[in-house]
Amino acid sequence: MPLVAESLKDGHFSQIAIEDGEVVGWLWGRPLFEGIWAWELRWLIVDQTRPRAGVGRALTESFEAWCQQRNILTIWLMTGEEMGETSLRGADLWADPFTPLATIQPVANSPFAFWQKMGYRFIGVIPDANGKGVPEYLMGKTLATLP
């Protein structure tokens, strides 16, 4: 509940998806770096009984449209490796980070793959963030249209 309360602060984006009178998804976005150019997509949660039903896509697209209306240039997010979502699970990213990072492959239907389908790019990693050999990934998307 503290996260939900924080998501409702002025200047944050918080949206739920409702189907048949039940909450089936929630997205929270928040400003970072003074909220002028870059926002964090902090949480996207979708009811596990409705996988691949378009709830996550709809919430994400709504957040992106909201950001575009406010001339926000970048949306970024973190996604974890707790469930073996990529080929880097168990890799020692401290020894030689660039070789494995250059060949990262998502596991089908993983959050990493979902974000790639939504147009988010892999832009960074925190090795061992969730335990030895279990990294956290930084992904981002530009909303800018260059002249």
Where on the chain are the PLM-derived regions?
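Conserved GNAT acetyl-CoA-binding A-motif
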Residues: C67-V107
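Conserved beta-strand in the GNAT
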Residues: I16, E22-P31, E40, I45
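Alpha-helical elements of Rossmann-like donor-binding domains used by nucleotide-donor carbohydrate transfer enzymes
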Residues: P2-L3, A58, S62, S110, ...
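Short coil/loop residues immediately preceding or within conserved phosphate-binding loops
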Residues: G11-H12, V24, I36, L41, ...
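Active-site rim helix/loop that mediates acceptor-substrate recognition in acyltransferases
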Residues: M1-E19, W28
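C-terminal "cap" of GNAT-fold acetyltransferases
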Residues: P97-P147
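Conserved acetyl-CoA binding element of GNAT-fold acetyltransferases
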Residues: W37-Q48, W76-G80
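Conserved acetyl-CoA-binding loop-helix of GNAT-fold acetyltransferases
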Residues: V46, R52-A65, W76, A91
